[in-house]
């Protein structure tokens, strides 16, 4: 969705890792966040990166070291990149009763939540950072059928899950790209929660 919005901008580009995206007018190239050799393919001219890659390592201390190494490399070798819009997750919030918002202080109670929060903290240390914390993402290319196809774990629960349509998420990111002085953290959910198997 964002690719079509920015395809006409010569300074816009995208990356892919395992599976090339559908053909688009947007310039794209392969990128492996885990390999320093791959970092050099990142262009030098943009000011903002939209980062959608999830944490790579399951061990929080090791992921912290890896992220710091990447950020240090970026500050030294890609000095024009000043801002990152990071797609995190509402999974950073504890799964217990309580009221949580963007400025709450909390400790995630899942490893994936801890890894996401570590990523947010480290990126904020090196860049001007906008964090978008979406709920479960649904819409074209995001259904349960695809998760089953790729062997992803599906939690079956009757508890409603906060979610957001992929087009609405893209709209939020587009707004942040065009408005660099917007808020630094957004919980991105709609008003139509569903059980986990419908997300």
Where are these regions (language model features)?
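N-terminal Rossmann-fold cofactor-binding loop
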Residues: 10-20, 32-33
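Conserved Rossmann-fold cofactor-binding substructure of NAD(P)-dependent oxidoreductases
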Residues: 25-47
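NAD(P)-cofactor binding segment of oxidoreductase domains
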Residues: 42-85, 118
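Conserved Rossmann-fold NAD(P)-dependent oxidoreductase catalytic core, especially the SDR/UDP-sugar
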Residues: 71-109
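Substrate-positioning beta->alpha
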Residues: 137, 143-146, 155-177, 184
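Mid/C-terminal beta-alpha module of Rossmann-like enzyme folds, strongest
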Residues: 172-175, 179-199
């Amino acid at each position: 969705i964002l690719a079509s919005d920015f395809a006409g901008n010569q300074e816009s580009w995208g990356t892919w890792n395992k599976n090339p995206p559908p053909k688009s007018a947007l310039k794209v190239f392969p990128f492996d966040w885990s390999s320093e050799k791959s970092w050099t393919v990142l262009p030098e001219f943009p000011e903002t990166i939209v980062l959608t890659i999830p944490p790579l390592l399951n061990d929080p201390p090791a992921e912290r070291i890896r992220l710091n190494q990447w950020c240090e490399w970026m500050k030294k070798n890609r000095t024009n990149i000043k801002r990152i819009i990071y797609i995190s997750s509402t999974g950073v919030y504890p799964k217990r009763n309580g009221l949580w918002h963007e400025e709450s202080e909390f400790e995630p109670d899942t490893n994936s939540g801890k890894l996401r929060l570590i990523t947010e903290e480290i990126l904020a240390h090196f860049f001007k950072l906008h964090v978008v914390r979406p709920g479960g993402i649904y819409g074209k290319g995001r259904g349960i059928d695809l998760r089953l196809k790729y062997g992803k774990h599906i939690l079956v629960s009757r508890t409603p899950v906060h979610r957001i349509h992929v087009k609405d998420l893209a709209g939020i990111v587009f707004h942040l790209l065009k408005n660099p002085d917007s808020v630094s953290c957004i919980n991105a959910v709609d008003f139509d929660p569903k059980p986990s198997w419908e997300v």
